[in-house]
């Protein structure tokens, strides 16, 4: 039986990971009393006595947690932004290819992808890898997410009885083009420049839809929407990320279509002049805790879908 410690188990992602793992008979969860959750010595002892540690912490706190590790047998799964572009860490998105799978399986340091970044990378990287898009491409992206993506503070803001009327409509943020996922988007896709990125939070708890619009002129010479469809069909053959030829729901596409699920659906819609690449998933599922548990399963050598809701 493997011992697992969740550092930051009281946060949104940490709680979801705990809920997924608590009933598993192949794992023993190390749980600190509430009064010791922020005690450095208690955390250090737990981090060094487990087999796998989840870090569900802000970036700086995650770095500090890593500095507490002295046991080189501990595998770390970090859900923060801190290590996602660090070459010494595996990037926890096995569907991106054999290199990603192999590094994940052999690494003791794994960075769990960001929620917005997961959709953008799933859509763009297979196209760059196949030369359908160039790494010099200037792309744009918008991403609509449920408010749980903002953590406990935003959840409380949206669910309080007397709240601002402004919360009833979608709200754009990241307006200065300095969102923390931009570096990750560019690095994993090997793009020279990150996209122009417009994240949007909506008045629904969880779910996410990420869109990358393209003109056919944005594609490499001679490439068409059919090449994109083929790329996704080839790339996503596993149980978690799936290509869907059509996601149209009577002319609409709901961002909450996979709320409560750990799968991701990708598709391309449009025509031979203009097209949109679309990824749909749950910001708390494949965008956070579901991806983390999938990585844990692979590290432990069990079915990657164990404990996932697909």
What are these regions (language model features)?
Residues 12-18, 118, 153, 211, ...:
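Short, electropositive, low-hydrophobicity segments enriched in small/polar residues
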Residues 7-13, 113, 145, 206, ...:
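Short glycine-rich loop/turn motifs that provide flexible caps or phosphate-binding loops at active sites
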Residues 1-173, 269-271:
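N-terminal Rossmann-like NAD(P) cofactor-binding subdomain of oxidoreductases
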Residues 237, 255-310:
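C-terminal helical cap and adjacent loop that interface with cofactors, partners, or active-site loops
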Residues 119-120, 220, 224, 287-288:
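Secondary-structure boundary/capping motif
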């Amino acid at each position: 039986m493997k011992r697992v410690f969740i550092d930051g188990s009281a946060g949104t992602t940490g709680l979801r990971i705990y809920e997924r793992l608590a009933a598993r008979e192949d794992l023993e969860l190390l749980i600190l009393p509430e009064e010791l959750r922020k005690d450095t010595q208690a955390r250090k002892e737990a981090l060094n006595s487990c087999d796998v540690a989840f870090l569900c912490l802000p970036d700086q706190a995650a770095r500090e947690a890593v500095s507490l590790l002295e046991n080189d047998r501990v595998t770390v799964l970090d859900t923060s932004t801190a290590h996602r572009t660090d070459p010494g860490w595996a990037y926890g998105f096995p569907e991106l290819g054999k290199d990603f799978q192999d590094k994940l399986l052999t690494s003791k340091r794994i960075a769990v992808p960001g929620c917005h970044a997961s959709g953008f990378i799933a859509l763009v990287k297979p196209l760059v890898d196949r030369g359908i898009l160039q790494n010099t491409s200037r792309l744009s992206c918008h991403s609509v997410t449920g408010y749980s993506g903002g953590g406990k503070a935003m959840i409380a803001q949206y669910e309080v009885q007397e709240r601002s009327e402004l919360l009833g409509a979608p709200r754009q943020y990241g307006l200065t083009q300095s969102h923390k996922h931009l570096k990750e988007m560019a690095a994993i896709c090997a793009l020279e420049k990150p996209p122009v990125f417009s994240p949007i939070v909506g008045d629904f708890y969880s779910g996410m839809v990420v869109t990358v619009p393209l003109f056919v002129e944005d594609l490499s010479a001679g490439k068409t929407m059919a090449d994109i469809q083929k790329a996704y069909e080839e790339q996503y053959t596993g149980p978690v990320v799936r290509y869907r030829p059509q996601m149209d729901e009577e002319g609409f596409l709901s961002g909450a279509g996979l709320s409560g699920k750990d799968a991701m659906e990708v598709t391309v819609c449009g025509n031979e002049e203009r097209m949109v690449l679309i990824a749909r998933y749950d910001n708390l599922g494949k965008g956070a805790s579901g991806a983390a548990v999938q990585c844990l399963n692979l590290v432990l050598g069990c079915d990657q879908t164990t404990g996932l809701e697909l």
